[in-house]
Amino acid sequence: MDNNPNINECIPYNCLSNPEVEVLGGERIETGYTPIDISLSLTQFLLSEFVPGAGFVLGLVDIIWGIFGPSQWDAFLVQIEQLINQRIEEFARNQAISRLEGLSNLYQIYAESFREWEADPTNPALREEMRIQFNDMNSALTTAIPLFAVQNYQVPLLSVYVQAANLHLSVLRDVSVFGQRWGFDAATINSRYNDLTRLIGNYTDYAVRWYNTGLERVWGPDSRDWVRYNQFRRELTLTVLDIVALFSNYDSRRYPIRTVSQLTREIYTNPVLENFDGSFRGMAQRIEQNIRQPHLMDILNSITIYTDVHRGFNYWSGHQITASPVGFSGPEFAFPLFGNAGNAAPPVLVSLTGLGIFRTLSSPLYRRIILGSGPNNQELFVLDGTEFSFASLTTNLPSTIYRQRGTVDSLDVIPPQDNSVPPRAGFSHRLSHVTMLSQAAGAVYTLRAPTFSWQHRSAEFNNIIPSSQITQIPLTKSTNLGSGTSVVKGPGFTGGDILRRTSPGQISTLRVNITAPLSQRYRVRIRYASTTNLQFHTSIDGRPINQGNFSATMSSGSNLQSGSFRTVGFTTPFNFSNGSSVFTLSAHVFNSGNEVYIDRIEFVPAEVTFEAEYDLERAQKAVNELFTSSNQIGLKTDVTDYHIDQVSNLVECLSDEFCLDEKQELSEKVKHAKRLSDERNLLQDPNFRGINRQLDRGWRGSTDITIQGGDDVFKENYVTLLGTFDECYPTYLYQKIDESKLKAYTRYQLRGYIEDSQDLEIYLIRYNAKHETVNVPGTGSLWPLSAQSPIGKCGEPNRCAPHLEWNPDLDCSCRDGEKCAHHSHHFSLDIDVGCTDLNEDLGVWVIFKIKTQDGHARLGNLEFLEEKPLVGEALARVKRAEKKWRDKREKLEWETNIVYKEAKESVDALFVNSQYDQLQADTNIAMIHAADKRVHSIREAYLPELSVIPGVNAAIFEELEGRIFTAFSLYDARNVIKNGDFNNGLSCWNVKGHVDVEEQNNQRSVLVVPEWEAEVSQEVRVCPGRGYILRVTAYKEGYGEGCVTIHEIENNTDELKFSNCVEEEIYPNNTVTCNDYTVNQEEYGGAYTSRNRGYNEAPSVPADYASVYEEKSYTDGRRENPCEFNRGYRDYTPLPVGYVTKELEYFPETDKVWIEIGETEGTFIVDSVELLLMEE
């Protein structure tokens, strides 16, 4: 305590005329129009008129947004500046006020447009105007609100932030309720509703966070600090937290009708003392301990005030309080004596009258008593009188006065909420409790100071439940707590304290009074937070009503935030048996040590239909329609795997808060349906766990196919097929359905879902090829929300966004050769199976293929399933197709035997023996190509639809093709010249001058020597004394000669010359002349030497015999794959007319020779250069 207090001193932040009105820079806020007055009026409005419509919109205009100018907004800023002693910089201040002014002007236009539209709601121009005004208002608020959260000024700007946030939530609620009538589509309305629910949490958490930051900032050790701390707590509860506590009611789908909320939190006026705020050092903690701890709400019945006397001064020395539980549901109880029961005068009884005490006028007494000098001086801090005024909506009630009326008016700091009526009717708070700050320091001073607690008037006494509204009752209004339940401090956004349990058991009992007919039915909802899954039980007057399982909402050890709480409900309605009933809530089925917090319960009239109810009914109907009967034994045939996934999404999107039990039950049914779908699906790995994982099982595909996880279209994996630059190398995906899985004389169906596609070819192959080319428009046209759907909090797709409903009539079903319009993303193809033969294992091939550059596809949920047994015409048709197939199969076997024999003879002739490890000495490249061509004349080596799938003759084809490969390898080993065919450009060749390697139309690479000074050479290692054959295939254009020379360092030179000859030229070792070239070219299909005899006889079977899979009703013409002859290990195209092959024999004397290519003039074109070692 100060040694020399001066009671006449007015300290800078405090004035004795009102110890709680601070002054900053000489400014004072006009009484009746302060931020507290405005906030109390807004809170009253939100509590009483929280129904969407023009009345609400215009109400906000009348209270704030239509009457505020810069000075009023500045008052909000000044209020907190004073409390935290921090002034906002001029730029930030002007920016905030300018934005608020802009929002105010814009909202007035919005409100007027709303009023006009509501008067004529079908007027197209007014509907369009509302869409424009909403978009403008929403954009302005989205831009402005972050400017009220400027770094370092979050606390001073907090009250205007909350005002703007409240306005934003109200506008978003408007579009959620009226958006469809304004002409917005469902996607936009749902997106804005998602914004609404998200921002309710964001704005709430922001406000509470910075309220707590500011509160911590003003705490200090002395009584002066506590005064400011308490003022900050009280005033920002009124201007921030009370408004934030009502944000959750903006959720229009959860609260579609009038909703009554109650604020049970308490605020405190300072201990009524004169010269209190600056006189006591280190007293802040002691004063705060005088504040009542979290507790159940009770009703103040009476205060018995005792009087003591000191040196002739009477004062309030102590008091006794009696109270009743809410609803007056139990016996009156008394609190322990506060202070001491003085007997200097008879006790004064202040009894509850009317609606409670709404005002106190107190007379603090400070005296310094001089008893002598020095330590004999004594100070007295006491209260020597108070008038208690009672609230009434109708008449003035006589007040009760303890000793005398004072001048310290509680209405100065807790003003009425409605200044249009007398304070007794327009009051905002009533007295709820009184504690006593007592302190004595021997002969130095005596302190006795009552501390008044005040509760908002919305916390009514009787827990009344009417029939026409949603009634929210905080559980701190319970009559009794269950053993193990405690009351804990609320998180700041619940409007009061909350209950807590850490073990299973009864939470509390609540006395409620029903004003509606007892036939009225209700549903109960619970707002809770929990670290564990649990089960809630409810009962009325001991009669069990509801029981349900609910999930954890938060992790252990985390702070309570807006997102920690969830409002859950029971779907089963009930009615009360008595007008006054006891409602009991319990929590069970969880492990002790977890935390369960309960904020409030809600009683909802049963006839109120929520969107969650519609969703539940729709989901129940969708789930039941999956099955053939109510016992869920089998799936309906037309229910696709994709549809089951969409029904699963429908179930997953059900509200946990409203119907968790039903949701879990439906989820189990959908999982059962999915398992049934998997069981009937004959495809292996329909969920695309991998491609090419197993050689003989599952999916096989080209390397450019990608598997992607689920998105907003697909719940499971799907595949993406891209286009290709070469139709002979398509993008493909295929799988074979084993014969063992098929039933004889049965129709099967391939179906699935295509998100989008272009040039996607789909095949089903057995006796014939069922084929469709499918072009499906992308998701932007038939699935409009695919690209617009918002994502979840972890980046997952939001499958709860609205989309087009599944309609089986829109399926793209291609049956019996009918063409498909492809207006749907669903597709299906049928194929009929005749007799089955496990030895033959014909099976069914399922193929997806894209062979164009612009082609693409995304598809999933593929199914191959039994459709129905074949009867009548369909049975006859498949038997006819099967017979035709077998007839052609027999013909193919006869033809194949002949072709195979001839091809094998051609291949065998290339080799010395049956080990196929050495070529004949005279085998040349043309002979190998001729044999390879004969091998490729074997039909049905691969499926014409996809040349990577083996056909009936694959085994014999690959046997002979393997030997051709061996022949090419042995031949390459004999040629000592590297890159002699120029397939690798000029690699290994030395070049002088300008030459080119070009790819001609026949896809062969050739060396072009266009200038006489150019030269191409290569050094080659050889074996001295061995014989070699130099063979060159080339073509000469224009005059002059082309020359290929072989030589050693000295002498031993030979050459082959080529010219565009006009007369026969004979070279010493060359066996071909210009005149006989044409004959040889015609005989062998290319330019070969005279040693190529015997390899061009016509085959014994016509080359164009029809495919054995042909079935006229499905495929017209011959199933021939134009890319079939491109298969194998070498592509061979006969040389154009004009090329000549010449050769010579050469015997080197050293281990190195040089091959040189040049010309004299014109152009010399070289196809290949070979230097072959002769056989010994």
UniProtKB/Swiss-Prot annotation:
CDD domains: delta_endotoxin_C. One of its GO terms (molecular function) is toxin activity. SUPFAM superfamilies: delta-Endotoxin (insectocide), middle domain, delta-Endotoxin (insectocide), N-terminal domain, Galactose-binding domain-like. Keywords: Sporulation, Toxin, Virulence. GO terms for biological process: sporulation resulting in formation of a cellular spore; symbiont-mediated killing of host cell. It comes from the Bacteria. The keyword Acyltransferase does not apply. InterPro entries: Cry1Ac-like_dom-VII, Cry_V, Galactose-bd-like_sf, Pest_crys, Pest_crys_Cry1Aa_dom-IV, Pest_crys_dom-III, Pest_crys_dom_I, Pest_crys_N_sf. Belongs to the delta endotoxin family. Toxic segment of the protein is located in the N-terminus. Promotes colloidosmotic lysis by binding to the midgut epithelial cells of many lepidopteran larvae. This is Pesticidal crystal protein Cry1Aa. It comes from Bacillus thuringiensis subsp. aizawai.
